[in-house]
């Protein structure tokens, strides 16, 4: 008889010691990577800036503040301008993810992804462009390059003074400077600070899956900023737990949003990555979400493979690509990783009270 395989510490708890879903005994399908995080994809780094100040009644411009910024570098902070092939999917378009016209046209984006609150999305985009310019050499600056950065948002106004515009340029830069590989924090951190999910405290969550194909092992990692769902909809590992945890009062129709980012080191072309982004939406469904009328459910998938081909500006390029018959196993890995990332965003959380005493239970 063989003994049970010990669960790695990073699968059980976040770096700050917050419980993750696996640590609480929730069973999931699939084999995660070393950290069960999007950072299992080599080169990917994630950083946060979390802003929590004040309590009591809302005073616009003063607080309470419950917000922040998340930064995600596809090829690490050491290569801030690096491009990646990508695909985009909007399951429900009541939200914003900038730079997607370029992704739809050319199948790529450049530089870091930022995720924040709805009214700080434009600021994050502009600061990213300025920061990228400042990190160029003098010769490159003379060419006056341009960027169309990826910045995404969900609404945190239930807990946060969203119209106070408390995220500043220095906060976006702080998230860049915090970017790292390895295990990353989850829950009420970064852009996820003031978010709610299934009427619990939501926010930042991540997970990964390993995929064996053609004698190689690839990784698919997911990162979400969860801010969607009604309590009764919640499913965990297929069990309808939300119906057993009713609210005292009906909160009305489903609002909120989710931003999902899927990274892989598998060599995929943009059209394949768009198909991956579509499958990420199934991860919401696995948790019980339905993409309500006022929900913005937006997904971006990118590959870290083929850096030379992605960044080539002329000539004939050669790229290594997966055969189409491989895609189904990556679809499955994506769905399971997104599902677990959402549930992790719930588990790795604590009760938060924000503006006007509104409380999101952890």
Which ranges hold each PLM region?
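Alpha/propeptide regions of enzymes that mature by internal proteolysis
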Residues: 2-362
């Amino acid at each position: 008889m063989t003994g049970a395989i010990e669960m790695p510490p990073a699968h059980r708890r976040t770096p700050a010691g917050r419980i993750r879903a696996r640590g609480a005994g929730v069973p999931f399908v699939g084999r995660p990577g070393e950290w069960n995080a999007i950072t299992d994809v080599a080169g990917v780094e994630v950083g946060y800036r979390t802003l929590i100040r004040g309590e009591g009644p809302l005073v616009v411009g003063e607080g309470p503040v419950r917000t922040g910024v998340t930064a995600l570098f596809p090829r690490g902070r050491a290569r801030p301008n690096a491009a990646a092939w990508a695909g985009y999917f909007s399951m429900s378009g009541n939200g914003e993810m900038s730079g997607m016209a370029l992704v739809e046209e050319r199948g790529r984006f450049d530089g870091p992804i930022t995720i924040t609150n709805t009214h700080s999305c434009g600021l994050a985009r502009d600061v990213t462009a300025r920061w990228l310019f400042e990190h160029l050499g003098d010769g490159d600056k003379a060419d006056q390059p341009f960027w169309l950065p990826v910045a995404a948002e969900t609404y945190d106004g239930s807990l946060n003074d969203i119209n106070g515009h408390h995220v500043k340029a220095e906060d976006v830069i702080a998230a860049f400077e915090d970017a790292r590989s390895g295990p990353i924090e989850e829950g009420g951190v970064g852009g996820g600070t003031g978010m709610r999910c299934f009427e619990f405290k939501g926010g930042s969550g991540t997970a990964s899956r390993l995929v064996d194909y053609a004698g190689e092992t690839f990784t698919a990692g997911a990162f979400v900023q969860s801010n969607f769902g009604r309590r009764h909809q919640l499913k965990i590992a297929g069990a309808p737990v939300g119906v057993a945890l009713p609210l005292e009062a009906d909160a009305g129709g489903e609002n909120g949003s989710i931003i999902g980012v899927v990274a892989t080191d598998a060599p995929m072309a943009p059209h394949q990555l768009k198909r991956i982004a579509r499958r990420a939406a199934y991860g919401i469904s696995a948790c019980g979400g339905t993409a309500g009328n006022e929900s913005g459910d937006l997904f971006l998938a990118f590959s870290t493979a083929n850096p030379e081909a992605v960044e080539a500006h002329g000539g004939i390029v050669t790229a290594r690509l997966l055969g189409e018959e491989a895609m189904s196993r990556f679809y499955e890995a994506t769905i399971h990783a997104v599902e677990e990332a959402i549930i992790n965003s719930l588990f790795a959380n604590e009760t938060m009270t924000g503006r006007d005493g509104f409380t999101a239970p952890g």
